[in-house]
A protein has these predicted regions:
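CheY-like receiver
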Residues: 123-154
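Acidic catalytic/metal-coordinating carboxylates
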Residues: 5, 36, 62-65
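Short hydrophobic/Thr-rich beta-strand motif most characteristic of the beta2 strand and flanking loop
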Residues: 28-35, 43
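Active-site residues of response regulator receiver
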Residues: 55
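The feature encodes the CheY-like receiver
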Residues: 17, 59, 83
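Short amphipathic alpha-helix used as the core "switch/output" element in two-component signaling
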Residues: 42, 64-76
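C-terminal output helix
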Residues: 107-117
């Protein structure tokens, strides 16, 4: 994995938070836990997270609404919705508001780990693509400036 991935677990159920933390930390991830959307927003202002596991039902805000708030402030963070109340409507809303994956409770931890791994690979691929585009732009711009410089010195 190289650098340790950071995961933010946002769930109001303490048992779920503890189970996820134990398993994810055993897999080598750095994990932070919060029980409200407000605390999640505060954490993401101070720290970078590769992934957020977001419960649909939180005491202060719906997880879907939290997705919308996080979409602009944490665009590189992968967002995975976890819910014990799966409906087609909330699945569609989740995807439309920026969820990268959707997991139904009670969840199979193997599926959760596989989803996290897939999301991290996608995040890494997007980052590499972005870096390549920047390098391409810089290379093109340097060539253009060199041509302009030569033209002005003639």
């Amino acid at each position: 994995m190289g650098e340790t991935a950071r995961i933010l677990v946002i769930d109001d159920d303490e048992n779920i938070r503890k189970v996820l933390a134990t398993i994810l930390e055993d897999e080598g991830y750095k994990v932070d836990l919060v029980d409200t959307a407000k605390k999640a927003i505060e954490k993401t202002k101070r720290n970078f997270y590769n992934i957020a596991l977001i419960d649909v039902r939180l005491p202060d805000m719906e997880g879907i609404e939290l997705l919308t708030k996080m979409k602009d402030t944490t665009p590189k963070m992968r967002k995975i919705i976890i819910t014990g109340y799966p409906t087609l409507q909330n699945a569609i809303q989740a995807v439309n508001r920026g969820a990268d994956a959707y997991i139904v409770k009670p969840f199979d931890m193997e599926k959760v780990l596989k989803t996290i791994e897939e999301q991290l690979k996608m995040q890494k691929a997007e980052e590499k693509y972005s870096q390549e585009r920047v390098a391409e732009f810089i290379e093109t711009r340097v060539k253009e400036l060199s041509v302009e410089k030569e033209a002005t010195h003639k």
